[in-house]
A protein has these predicted regions:
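Active-site-proximal alpha-helix that buttresses catalytic centers in soluble enzyme cores
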Residues: 4, 9-75
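Phosphate-handling substructures
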Residues: 72-131
């Protein structure tokens, strides 16, 4: 069986990342710093042979992938697929709120005493989205 390598790159820094806001399905654009960082990642992957590329359907993921592919010598020939099934978590009513508020609310609404207890326990995506 042939060896397969999977490379996972997180999207570049966004406006909400800068503002410490919860961002799952809500979408904010990459900052200049985020775009610059992804260009550097792309430069670092120039010698890597890719068969295909995938991203979620969020604008920040699509922009990230376009930047990565623009830095690759074969980028125009690498098949690129946008797939909503790999979209980030939806944080429900917490979307767009402050990160600190989310981390204060999640343990309580999921019936944990502390944030540490929450992280020590498996919580499903559905439980978080419905919190």
């Amino acid at each position: 069986m042939a060896e397969t390598n999977l490379y996972i790159v997180r999207h570049g820094k966004t406006m909400f990342n800068t503002l410490a806001r919860v961002q799952g399905w809500c979408d904010t654009p990459l900052t200049q710093s985020g775009r610059d960082g992804i260009h550097y990642v792309g430069l670092g992957l120039q010698d890597t042979k890719f068969e295909e590329a995938y991203s979620s359907d969020s604008g920040r993921a699509i922009e990230t992938m376009r930047i990565l592919l623009s830095e690759h010598p074969d980028g125009k020939d690498i098949p690129y697929h946008v797939d909503p099934r790999i979209r980030e978590w939806c944080f429900g009513s917490l979307e767009g709120g402050f990160d600190a508020e989310m981390w204060g609310v999640l343990p309580r609404v999921l019936n944990f005493k502390t944030e540490d207890e929450l992280f020590a326990t498996e919580v499903t995506f559905e439980e978080i989205a419905n919190a």
